[in-house]
From Swiss-Prot:
UniProt keyword annotation of NADP present: yes
Function: Catalyzes the conversion of 4-hydroxy-tetrahydrodipicolinate (HTPA) to tetrahydrodipicolinate.
Record-given protein name: 4-hydroxy-tetrahydrodipicolinate reductase
One BP term from GO: lysine biosynthetic process via diaminopimelate
Binding site for (S)-2,3,4,5-tetrahydrodipicolinate: H159, G168, T169
Gene: dapB
Catalytic activity: (S)-2,3,4,5-tetrahydrodipicolinate + NAD(+) + H2O = (2S,4S)-4-hydroxy-2,3,4,5-tetrahydrodipicolinate + NADH + H(+); (S)-2,3,4,5-tetrahydrodipicolinate + NADP(+) + H2O = (2S,4S)-4-hydroxy-2,3,4,5-tetrahydrodipicolinate + NADPH + H(+)
Length: 270
């Protein structure tokens, strides 16, 4: 991965967008080529570096990718499902690689992403933290050893502004555990409990969601038996961990053939 990779960041004015700009500034092998905000945003025309608090970068926030076609190699997108689909379509038409950190896609949108990825390289992951991706590997081992005789619960917490629940990371945790145990998550997942629920079914995987304050992201998988329980927890204290992972993915994906990849592949954990 020699030389600099030029990245464009959409949703540049949001919390994650500003963190991505800061991460790009601090990474030796990354060059911020473009920063995009929605049409009509008051941030259009602002210097991206000044917005992110790293000083002037001479990268002016624009309101369309069409103005930046020649300025970047990889698009980084942590926006919203509908917007990400539009951006991916643009990347296919302009032969750009893409890193997607957006969560909350429905099944139809996932099918669209798979189809688009046949024409351009895409890394998509619900969480780009190195620690979270290692946690998924640990969950495989825990499920293999303890999953068939323990009650499995997944608890996640995020800031009050997060729009989807459970988080994409929590759902991925459930998918990893269910796949390891030969279960179908759509059939065994229980999302919240209320009222008289009856005795717990050992085959289920429970999900609990917290939305409060400025929690960046906390995820715990509990394997509970009589007399003991194992908890595997990841806590993010800053969005920078996700941004740094996205930069790592950008450097990696630009050298790949068309296809849909995840952070496990970026990190060599597969």
């Amino acid at each position: 991965m020699g030389g600099q990779v030029r990245v464009a960041i959409v949703g540049a004015g949001g919390r994650m967008g500003r963190t991505l700009i800061e991460a790009a500034y601090h990474q030796e092998h990354i060059l911020l080529g473009a920063a995009i905000e929605r049409a009509g945003s008051s941030l259009v025309g602002v210097d991206a570096g000044e917005l992110a608090g790293v000083g002037k970068l001479n990268v002016i926030i624009m309101d369309s990718l069409d103005y930046a076609t020649d300025d970047f190699d990889v698009l980084i997108d942590f926006t919203a499902p509908d917007a990400s689909i539009v951006h991916l379509d643009w990347c296919v038409r302009h032969k750009k690689a893409m890193v997607i950190g957006t969560t909350g896609f429905n099944q139809a949108q996932k099918i669209q992403i798979n189809a688009f990825a046949e024409q351009t390289p895409v890394v998509m992951a619900p969480n780009m933290s190195v620690g979270v991706n290692l946690m998924w590997k640990l969950l495989e081992l825990a499920a293999e050893v303890m999953g068939d005789y323990t009650d499995i619960e997944i608890i996640e917490g995020h800031h009050r502004h997060k729009k989807d629940a459970p988080s994409g990371t929590a759902l991925k945790m459930g998918e990893v555990i269910a796949k390891t145990l030969g279960r179908d998550l759509e059939k065994c997942a229980v999302y919240g409990r209320e009222g008289i629920t009856g005795e717990r079914d050992r085959e289920t995987i429970g999900f609990a969601t917290i939305r409060a304050g400025d929690l960046v992201g906390e995820h715990t998988a509990m394997f509970a038996d009589i007399g003991e329980r194992l908890e595997i927890t990841h806590k993010a204290s800053s969005r920078m961990t996700f941004a740094n992972g996205a930069m790592r993915a950008a450097r990696w994906v630009v050298e790949q053939k068309p296809g849909l990849y995840d952070m496990q592949q970026v990190l060599g954990l597969n």
